[in-house]
């Protein structure tokens, strides 16, 4: 039961696009992610492979309070037609976990819908900027709360890529104090069969 509880916790953390509670916006506020354009002619085949999470910009209070507990996080991406199969690898209590999810197609290349647990609904995902071989900036929105994520193929992050990310963060009305940089070491490459959570089949 303890193992199962940890698995559920990890799924909730990943589905939220960050690590926890969000500051609430008025219900009447427009959806910020609807105005964000995906990369022109987004190519899921070129986007496939491994991405390392370098930084997250978010207004999540829990993220700011518990940022010192952030773990190195890697994404393994495989195209499934217009959709993408995404496996996230990160540690929880020192153990490597794999969470398998499906970024569902929406009819717009580069714009995806990720089913998620809980009453706050699905996560909207936009691959807004990428050169495919070095970096990618993804926006995630759930219950009208937006986060900006920077992924890279390898570390360290170049100054030009960091500058592009910081510009995106500013455009999302987030400050530098709301940016969390993730560890650059300790990445998980695999998880054993007892630490795999398949959200696709649920």
Swiss-Prot record:
UniProt-recorded Gene Ontology molecular function terms: complement binding; retinol binding
* Quaternary structure, from the entry: Heterotrimer of 3 chains: alpha (C8A), beta (C8B) and gamma (C8G); the alpha and gamma chains are disulfide bonded. Component of the membrane attack complex (MAC), composed of complement C5b, C6, C7, C8A, C8B, C8G and multiple copies of the pore-forming subunit C9.
Q: Name one GO cellular component term.
A: blood microparticle
Keywords noted in UniProt: Complement alternate pathway, Complement pathway, Cytolysis, Disulfide bond, Glycoprotein, Immunity, Innate immunity, Membrane, Membrane attack complex, Retinol-binding, Secreted, Signal, Target cell membrane, Target membrane
**Stated family:** Belongs to the calycin superfamily. Lipocalin family.
Residues bearing glycans: 173
Q: What is a single Pfam family found in this protein's UniProt entry?
A: Lipocalin
What is the disulfide pattern of this chain? 96-188
- The signal peptide here is 1-23
Q: How is this protein's activity controlled?
A: Membrane attack complex (MAC) assembly is inhibited by CD59, thereby protecting self-cells from damage during complement activation. MAC assembly is also inhibited by clusterin (CLU) chaperones that inhibit polymerization of C9.
Protein name in UniProt: Complement component C8 gamma chain
* Gene that specifies this protein: C8G
The record, for InterPro entries, names:
A1-microglobln, C8G, Calycin, Lipocalin_CS, Lipocln_cytosolic_FA-bd_dom
Its biological purpose is as follows: Component of the membrane attack complex (MAC), a multiprotein complex activated by the complement cascade, which inserts into a target cell membrane and forms a pore, leading to target cell membrane rupture and cell lysis. The MAC is initiated by proteolytic cleavage of C5 into complement C5b in response to the classical, alternative, lectin and GZMK complement pathways. The complement pathways consist in a cascade of proteins that leads to phagocytosis and breakdown of pathogens and signaling that strengthens the adaptive immune system.
Q: Name one GO biological process term.
A: complement activation, classical pathway
State the compartments where it is located: Secreted; Target cell membrane
